């Protein structure tokens, strides 16, 4: 797909024509040319482009005569002046001298051929962009968005949009001002996998949370929708990735039931498994989530789709062993639910499945995946080895199936992640936010944000706070024969600036 920009040419000068002692009058007849458009291969965002102030466009006649160079202004549209050339076949070329890491203009390389045959001959130039572009569209008045990392740069303004051209594979962090506020949104953008052109649209105020790959803010400036950034696809061995933990600058993941009893260290930017650590004295019946204290990693073996398990457990591993050994030993915490009396198999039709857990103040907080009500029950357990009956604390009416949880180690913010199975827009991925977590209940009113749909991003499974309140998320493979085949992946959701 190409992007077509209507432009004109302004002729400032050319070299002399080649002398021919016996000219053919028909061949020497001149025609007037005007550039109609510039088409860039695979440039899809339909907004105005900004080029260098001038280009030196080279024209080479097929008869081998000396090239003609025209100095043109590619940003003017239209310009009435014409190029006068003799009839014939011409090759044209232009290439920007450099492609800066960040710039306010789009460097290009143009090449092609045209026939100069008729008066007022239209010419369409084609080429490729040498950099990529980001456009941010805000439907409210604001100061310019900023590139926050790896450099601090204001986005440039062009008509009603803000834009920046870049030539780097780095992960870019963008700060987008919230309306009438000192707060901001954080949007990540990965240079090496992003398309040539990307548009981020922010709408305010909105009450429609239908997911359209845009950011929608409600009247209180809370994001109804956010755009996750996929940073890698995971190896096939991680098709059933289920839980995440960020420890000492490393990302760890587990697979769920019927997989190995291993914790995997993942390179989030390549998706490769750096190493696998066996939990030698543990069995993976259905590992679902990870939680951590300052000294230990907890593995939740409490997946319970059928509702008939009597061996629910949590494994406790020393972080010092995890970071330095390829095989570790675990302590075991066994538990049951105080209100479960029926253990007959009841596939996905009960309230005793669990995929989410956090650690706080020597306690493990569990949040169930309630298949019937699409709410979650909040239980608490001691974090020491032993056999316990979990203590029921509260029910949270989320209207979704919960698959992961984590606590921000800095702010104490609690985030739950899951998806909606039912309703008018099924298979949506959601985040639920609480101000914090006490010993007996979650704190603050719930706020929620949609982050995508399963047919585009896979099943949401793991969540881990990264830095400055931003989060890693993982999704397991999603297959619908002949329709979808979404590989497992790691992504980032920018939350910095919201709290």
Stretch-by-stretch model annotation:
Residues 85-95:
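A short tyrosine-centered beta-strand micro-motif
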Residues 220-499:
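Sequence/structural signature of beta-propeller domains
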Residues 69-83, 121, 148-164:
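Short, solvent-exposed S/T- and G/P-enriched segments that are highly enriched in secreted/extracellular
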Residues 122-150, 198-223, 248:
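Compositionally biased low-complexity segments at domain edges in trafficked proteins
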């Amino acid at each position: 797909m190409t992007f077509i920009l209507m432009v004109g040419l302004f002729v400032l000068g050319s070299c002399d024509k080649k002398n021919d002692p016996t000219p053919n009058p028909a061949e020497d007849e001149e025609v007037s040319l005007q550039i109609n458009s510039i088409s860039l291969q695979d440039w899809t965002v339909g907004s105005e482009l900004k080029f260098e102030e001038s280009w030196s466009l080279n024209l080479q006649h097929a008869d081998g005569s000396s090239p003609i160079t025209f100095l043109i202004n590619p940003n003017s549209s239209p310009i009435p002046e014409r190029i006068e050339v003799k009839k014939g076949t011409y090759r044209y070329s232009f290439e920007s001298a450099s492609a800066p890491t960040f710039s306010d203009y789009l460097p290009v390389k143009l090449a092609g051929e045209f026939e100069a045959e008729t008066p007022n001959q239209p010419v369409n130039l084609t080429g490729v962009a040498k950099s990529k572009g980001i456009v941010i569209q805000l439907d409210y008045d604001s100061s310019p968005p900023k590139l926050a990392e790896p450099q601090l740069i204001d986005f440039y303004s062009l008509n009603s949009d803000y834009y920046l051209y870049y030539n780097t594979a780095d992960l870019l962090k963008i700060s987008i001002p919230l309306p009438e506020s000192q707060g901001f949104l954080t949007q990540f953008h990965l240079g090496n996998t992003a398309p040539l052109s990307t548009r981020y649209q922010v709408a305010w105020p909105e009450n429609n949370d239908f997911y359209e790959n845009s950011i929608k803010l409600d009247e209180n400036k809370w994001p109804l929708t956010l755009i996750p950034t996929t940073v890698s696809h995971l190896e096939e061995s991680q098709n059933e990735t289920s839980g995440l933990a960020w420890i000492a600058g490393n990302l760890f993941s587990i697979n769920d039931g019927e997989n190995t009893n291993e914790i995997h260290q993942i390179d989030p930017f390549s998706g490769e498994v750096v190493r696998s650590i066996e939990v030698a004295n543990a069995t993976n019946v259905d590992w679902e989530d990870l939680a951590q204290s300052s000294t230990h990693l907890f593995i939740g073996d409490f997946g319970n789709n059928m509702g008939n398990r009597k061996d629910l457990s949590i494994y406790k591993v020393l972080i010092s062993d995890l970071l330095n050994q390829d095989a570790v030993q675990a302590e075991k915490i066994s538990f049951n639910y105080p209100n479960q009396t029926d253990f007959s198999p009841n596939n996905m039709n009960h309230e005793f499945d669990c995929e989410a857990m956090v650690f706080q103040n020597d306690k493990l907080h569990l949040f169930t995946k309630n298949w019937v009500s699409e709410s979650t029950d909040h239980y608490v357990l001691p974090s020491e080895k032993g056999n316990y009956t979990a203590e029921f604390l509260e029910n949270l009416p989320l209207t979704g199936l919960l698959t992961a949880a984590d606590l921000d180690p800095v702010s104490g913010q609690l985030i739950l992640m899951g998806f909606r199975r039912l309703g008018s827009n099924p298979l949506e991925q959601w985040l639920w936010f609480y101000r914090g977590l006490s010993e007996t209940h979650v704190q603050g009113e719930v706020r929620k944000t949609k982050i995508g749909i399963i047919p585009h991003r896979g099943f949401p499974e793991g969540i881990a706070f990264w830095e400055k309140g931003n989060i890693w998320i993982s999704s397991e493979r999603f297959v619908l024969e002949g329709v979808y085949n979404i590989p497992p992946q790691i992504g980032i959701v920018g939350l910095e600036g919201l709290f």
